[in-house]
């Protein structure tokens, strides 16, 4: 598309308020979904999901603007940025997400967005794919959901950091009373992180994906202090464990860091 967004229009909302919005999604969208999105594509989709209200029973059209999206994501506001965001929205409509349902033994294949419109002045209307409704709507009644503050994923620079962050949030079943942990074979972890096949060996996966993701999360996320452990059979790594040691491993604590349950508001 042409870079026709030549000037900023002030569609401003409080950026801090926007970044404090909660992203809630069914656990299957974190642990069983296969997709390959860029860092900014994940952030834009998280932003759109954060617009869903707790009581929504169907997807409403999300009304926003390229100005607002760039502001919330901390991007430089320019015609070039707006053009890139438009292409990001296009990719979210075209790129596949595959979610396997073990109960029905079916795989749902869909795009992230059903459709979107962008005006010449940069206003955006987007609608989430209807196939994602079971994973984003009426989560309180379904249970098995994970929530996080939008600002957490916005500040992460790597798509692998965001994927690992979401996995660790999903693993926090006891809201900080016991240290969350994920345990997988290197092969399973590579799939969950959507790592390329060239990172098939544990050494390469750790160097290029896992260690950098852990380092960035530990630096930027205030309630995460991730620690990596491996189990070996001979010289081969057969299991990977990642703990959030910000919380105690085995014993409960009297005053855990509070996490507001957005769905109970």
PLM regions with names:
Residues 1-265:
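Charged, alpha-helix-forming regions
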